[in-house]
Amino acid sequence: MHTTVRRYEGIDQSRKSELAKKVGENLLPRLSKLPGFSGYYLIDADKDVMSSISFFDTSAQADESTRFVASWLREEKLENVVPNSPKITDGEVIVHKTNGAFKA
């Protein structure tokens, strides 16, 4: 399993709710149809910071998801809400455990 963490800084605080709604209603249904998709989380990390974590089967699929998300942000004209490119960390998951009871 491969994970991509994207840290977005400089988020327009007054539009965070709008962004989260668009991610949930528009991006996530499309992202979840990409090959190898395993999971996605959006995190309100700080006053002007949001992070996302996505999980895919392979490194190539995870890389494609990063391109897909960047394209989606442009399509949705969210450059004013998310003005900076994300700081990206990606790699293979080497240890993980869930209990299956997590709820957002």
Give a label for each model feature.
Residues 75-77:
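Short catalytic/binding micro-motifs of nucleotide second-messenger systems
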